[in-house]
Structure formats: structure tokens, C-alpha cells
């Protein structure tokens, strides 16, 4: 059978702990996207660094295998909704951490109007009231694929699935008040 793989950290901590500009930027992002802690932000920053590192390596590489890997990277980023279909490898280098944070399930639930606030969106997800593609997802940091974006709804067994739920009525009124 073999031993299970060793669990590794999925994030890198900053190289210096007290750089004021970075701390201010992290505080703003943490508040804007209602992240639980900086570790969530660092996880997405590390993911972005990995995409950018691969893109830089592939820009310098030549050959058939490099071309295959270029296409795979661009397809992956397109599926995640981070890049358009006609994007070039240089576009990967211009991605920001906010682009990645915009693809989180928590952010998309809020933007779709299923929750009044981004914090409420997080709570709905963790409590199992949101499903993606018919599957309940309990991780607010789940990166939603482009084809799954339209399938984000309230879970069938959730009380929020009923149109007459009091909280849904409040959310609908808030939507109508924002449009007027």
C-alpha cells in the first residue's frame, strides 16, 4: 500500500514580518474579502506566485514540451476564470492576488446576491447552505471554475431554498433597494 504523503503547507509566509506597506495591503484585502486570517491570503498569494513562476519559466523555454505546458497553463487559468480564452502567457504575469480572491466561492456568493454581506456569504457556505453544481461546498476558499459559476445556488435541503424564508426576503429587499 505505501505510506501516505506528508502534509505540506500550501502557503509561504512573508520573508519579513513587519513591512508596513505589506501589512496595510494585507489588512485591506482581509477586510474587503472577509478572510478569516492572513494565512488564507498567503495561500492565494502562493498559488499566484506558482502560476507566475511557471509562466516565466515557460516564456524562456523552447521546444515542443514547453508549448504543450504553455497551453495547459493557459487552459487551467481560463477554466478557473482568471484569464480570457485568447490570453497570452504575458497575461499570467499581470495577474494580481485580487483576481484570485474574486474567484473564491465566498466572493461569488456575495456578488450573486445570495448573501447580504461577504461575511454572511462565508457563514452560509460553512453552514452548508450553498451548493455548486449540485454538490454542497463548505469551503469559502474554493476557487469556482468558469463553468460552475452559473450553478451556485442555495442547497436543496437548506431552509434558504424556500422563497418564503425571512432572510431571503430581506436579501431580496436589499437587492431591490440597491437597484432603485
Swiss-Prot record:
The gene is rps4. This is Small ribosomal subunit protein uS4. Pfam families: Ribosomal_S4, S4. Belongs to the universal ribosomal protein uS4 family. One of the primary rRNA binding proteins, it binds directly to 16S rRNA where it nucleates assembly of the body of the 30S subunit. With S5 and S12 plays an important role in translational accuracy. One of its GO terms (cellular component) is small ribosomal subunit. Keywords: Ribonucleoprotein, Ribosomal protein, RNA-binding, rRNA-binding. Gene3D superfamilies: RNA-binding S4 domain. Part of the 30S ribosomal subunit. Contacts protein S5. The interaction surface between S4 and S5 is involved in control of translational fidelity. SUPFAM superfamilies: Alpha-L RNA-binding motif. GO terms for molecular function: rRNA binding; structural constituent of ribosome. Residues 103-165 form the S4 RNA-binding domain. One of its GO terms (biological process) is ribosomal small subunit biogenesis.
Amino acid at each position: 500500500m505505501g505510506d501516505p504523503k506528508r502534509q505540506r503547507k500550501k502557503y509561504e509566509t512573508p520573508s519579513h514580518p513587519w513591512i508596513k506597506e505589506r501589512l496595510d495591503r494585507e489588512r485591506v484585502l482581509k477586510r474587503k474579502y472577509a478572510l478569516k486570517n492572513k494565512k488564507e491570503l498567503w495561500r492565494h498569494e502562493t498559488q499566484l506566485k506558482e502560476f507566475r513562476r511557471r509562466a516565466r519559466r515557460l516564456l524562456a523555454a523552447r521546444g515542443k514540451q514547453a508549448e504543450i505546458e504553455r497551453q495547459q497553463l493557459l487552459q487551467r487559468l481560463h477554466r478557473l476564470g482568471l484569464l480570457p480564452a485568447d490570453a497570452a502567457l504575458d497575461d499570467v504575469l499581470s495577474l494580481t492576488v485580487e483576481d484570485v480572491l474574486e474567484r473564491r466561492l465566498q466572493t461569488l456568493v456575495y456578488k450573486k446576491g445570495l448573501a447580504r454581506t461577504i461575511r454572511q456569504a462565508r457563514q452560509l457556505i460553512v453552514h452548508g447552505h450553498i451548493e455548486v453544481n449540485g454538490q454542497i461546498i463548505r469551503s469559502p476558499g474554493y476557487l469556482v471554475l468558469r463553468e460552475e459559476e452559473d450553478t451556485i445556488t442555495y442547497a436543496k435541503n437548506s431552509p434558504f431554498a424556500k422563497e418564503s424564508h425571512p432572510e431571503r426576503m430581506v436579501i431580496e429587499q436589499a437587492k431591490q433597494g440597491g437597484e432603485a
